[in-house]
Amino acid sequence: MDIVSIAWAALMVVFSFSLSLVVWGRSGL
């Protein structure tokens, strides 16, 4: 694995995690 694929994987994880936090926040958790 090169640094580009690692950076993309980390970016997708952070994006999906922040998106789920926004959804949970709007649902009134």
UniProtKB/Swiss-Prot annotation:
Where is this protein primarily located?
plastid
Keyword Zinc-finger (UniProt): no
- Residues annotated as transmembrane: 3-23
* UniProt topology in membrane: Single-pass membrane protein
| Key words of the record | Chloroplast, Electron transport, Membrane, Photosynthesis, Plastid, Thylakoid, Transmembrane, Transmembrane helix, Transport
Q: Which GO terms describe its molecular function?
A: electron transporter, transferring electrons within cytochrome b6/f complex of photosystem II activity
**Family to which the UniProt record says this protein belongs:** Belongs to the PetN family.
Q: What does this protein do?
A: Component of the cytochrome b6-f complex, which mediates electron transfer between photosystem II (PSII) and photosystem I (PSI), cyclic electron flow around PSI, and state transitions.
Q: What is this protein called?
A: Cytochrome b6-f complex subunit 8
